A protein has these predicted regions:
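Conserved C-terminal structural/oligomerization subdomain of aldehyde/semialdehyde dehydrogenase
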Residues: 1-109
Length: 109
C-alpha cells in the first residue's frame, strides 16, 4: 500500500533516520497529490513540507474541508494543473492582448 496512490483514511508508518531521509522516502514515488508533516516545531515542519513533491502538504493535520479558492491538484502521476480559484482559471486559459484601431492613428506615419 505504501507505493500506491490510495484514497481513504490510510496511514503508512515508515521508520527513517532524520528529516533528510524522511523527505527522500516521501519523494521516492511516482505520485504526489497530498502529503502531511507532523511535528512540535512548526517552523521546522514547514521547511520539511516545502521539500516534499506534492500538490498539497498539510502540517499537523489533514484537510478538514475543501476550500473553493485554493488551488487543488497534484504533481507527477497524480495529475497536471490546478483547479479552484484564480489558479484554476489561469491553468485552463491563455492570456492574450488584442487591439483594434477604430479611429485615426495615434502616431503620424
Amino acid at each position: 500500500i505504501y507505493g500506491e496512490e490510495s484514497f481513504g483514511p490510510v496511514v503508512c508508518v515508515v521508520r527513517v533516520n532524520g528529516a533528510d531521509e524522511a523527505v527522500r522516502v516521501a519523494n521516492d514515488t511516482e505520485y504526489g497529490l497530498s502529503a502531511a508533516v507532523f511535528g512540535r516545531d512548526i517552523a521546522r515542519a514547514l521547511e520539511i513540507a516545502k521539500r516534499i513533491d506534492s500538490g498539497i502538504c498539510h502540517v499537523n493535520g489533514p484537510t478538514v474541508h475543501d476550500e473553493a479558492q485554493m488551488p487543488f491538484g497534484g504533481v507527477k502521476a497524480s495529475g497536471y494543473g490546478r483547479f479552484g480559484g484564480k489558479a484554476g482559471i489561469a491553468e485552463f486559459t491563455e492570456l492574450r492582448w488584442i487591439t483594434i484601431e477604430t479611429g485615426p492613428q495615434h502616431y503620424p506615419i
